[in-house]
């Protein structure tokens, strides 16, 4: 049987993805306000 990806690893990757997206969003808005 093909080895499946552990559920906890999927959760960690999803969490990191969300944190990265939120970080880029807040950083972009902060940089935009600072440049304005």
From Swiss-Prot:
It is a single-pass membrane protein. The chain crosses the membrane at residues 5-25. It is found in: Cell inner membrane. GO terms for cellular component: photosystem II; photosystem II reaction center; plasma membrane. GO terms for biological process: photosynthesis. Coiled coil: none annotated. It comes from the Bacteria. PSII is composed of 1 copy each of membrane proteins PsbA, PsbB, PsbC, PsbD, PsbE, PsbF, PsbH, PsbI, PsbJ, PsbK, PsbL, PsbM, PsbT, PsbX, Psb30/Ycf12, peripheral proteins PsbO, CyanoQ (PsbQ), PsbU, PsbV and a large number of cofactors. It forms dimeric complexes. HAMAP family: PSII_PsbJ. Belongs to the PsbJ family. This is Photosystem II reaction center protein J. It comes from Gloeobacter violaceus (strain ATCC 29082 / PCC 7421). The gene is psbJ.
């Amino acid at each position: 049987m093909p080895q499946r990806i552990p559920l906890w690893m999927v959760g960690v990757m999803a969490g990191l993805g969300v944190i990265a997206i939120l970080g880029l969003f807040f950083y972009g808005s902060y940089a935009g306000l600072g440049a304005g």
